[in-house]
Design a protein with these regions (language model features):
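Amphipathic alpha-helical interface elements
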Residues: 1-233
Length: 233
């Protein structure tokens, strides 16, 4: 299968009903890329909802709009991620009264033995499984960071003065998805504390689930912005 050079891609676009010509639009196609640009922006939401473009001007305007939208959201998204991480971290440290990851597991993460009194056996088992999954995820993240010589983690493993990685260092390598899962595994009291620190309306959040559901909702948008994926749809 042969690849197409820019001129051939322009002919292919014209054959597909997209008007494109001249050095200006050729440069725009080169800069935005055929696969990232045209192929990435010709649909809205999914491949079954094709946008009715007839000229490359329309395609390029859509790409520019999407880029401007990402630029507008980037700073705000980074602020939200950083603020929520630090507020959650402070709450965990205070409620665990320790910076130890093991103490975090024992004191502020829900499991079989600290499940609500009203929990059924099955609910207790689910909480314990979630806790085990969390521990496995955190260990995998630490192992990967160590393998990649991340100084935020290797400092603690390679220094005889430390016995383990503290919670605050763990937070430095957590993705937004990791953060959301950790928040979902915390005890009700700690989720309640974090929610109030964030001034969330807890009166409409009986189970204190909004804190991690918001993070899950924002996660995909954050990743799309960071990796220059399409966000306008």
């Amino acid at each position: 299968m042969s690849y197409k050079k820019t001129d051939a891609l322009m002919r292919h676009l014209r054959d597909s009903g997209i008007s494109i010509q001249g050095p200006k639009q050729k440069r725009q196609l080169i800069n935005t890329g055929y696969f990232h640009g045209y192929k990435g922006y010709r649909f809205f939401g999914n491949a079954h909802r094709r946008l009715p473009f007839t000229s490359y001007d329309e395609v390029y305007a859509t790409i520019q709009y999407d880029s401007d939208l990402k630029a507008l959201l980037y700073g705000k998204m980074m602020f939200i991620e950083t603020a929520v991480k630090n507020i959650a971290l402070e709450s965990i440290l205070v409620n665990a009264n320790s910076e130890s990851i093991q103490d975090m597991y024992d004191k502020v993460v829900s499991g079989y033995n600290n499940a609500p009194a009203s929990a059924t056996i099955e609910q207790k088992r689910k909480l314990q499984q979630n806790k085990l999954n969390l521990q496995n995820s955190i260990q995998s993240s630490l192992a990967y960071a160590y393998k990649k010589n991340n100084p935020k983690i290797t400092h603690f493993y390679n220094n005889i003065g430390y016995s383990d990685v503290p919670v605050w260092a763990l937070f430095e390598i957590m993705t937004m998805g990791d953060l959301g899962y950790l928040l979902s595994c915390l005890t009700y009291d700690v989720r309640d504390d974090i929610s109030k620190r964030l001034f969330l309306n807890v009166s409409c959040d009986t189970d204190r689930q909004l804190i991690y559901k918001y993070i899950y909702t924002l996660k995909d948008l954050r990743n799309a912005i960071a990796h220059n994926a399409v966000v306008f749809d």
